[in-house]
């Protein structure tokens, strides 16, 4: 299949789609990992939300073992947009594949009775 130029760059197309989403849905949520892609998406969505005076749900699923700098960045984003987000910081026990041990193929983040790597923030669900 041949390429068909659309006459629009990726950034402008993304902004149009975000605006369309705000036009067509009463509630908007963004899943946020703290990585570069979801950070760019969050900034773009929040630009539109602030322009329209709307709040956005921001979901972060905390797997307990993320790097401190990632957790710090996520908190900074929640703080930056505090007036415009409904924060959903989820820190619940979730069974995960354990790629660092052949003896324990599963690891449960935030497991009951386990010593946690760090404490979840007070706002965590």
Model-based region annotation:
Residues 1-125:
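ATP-dependent adenylation/nucleotidyltransferase module used to activate substrates
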């Amino acid at each position: 299949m041949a390429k068909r130029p659309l006459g629009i760059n990726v950034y402008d197309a993304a902004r149009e789609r975000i605006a369309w989403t705000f036009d067509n849905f009463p509630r908007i949520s963004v899943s946020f990992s703290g990585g570069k892609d979801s950070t760019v998406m969050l900034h773009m969505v929040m630009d539109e939300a602030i322009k329209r005076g709307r709040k956005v749900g921001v979901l972060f699923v905390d797997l307990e073992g993320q790097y401190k700098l990632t957790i710090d960045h996520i908190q900074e984003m929640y703080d930056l947009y505090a007036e415009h987000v409904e924060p959903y910081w989820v820190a619940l026990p979730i069974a995960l594949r354990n790629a660092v041990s052949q003896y324990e193929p599963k690891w449960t983040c935030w497991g009951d009775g386990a010593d946690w790597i760090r404490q979840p923030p007070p706002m965590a669900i």
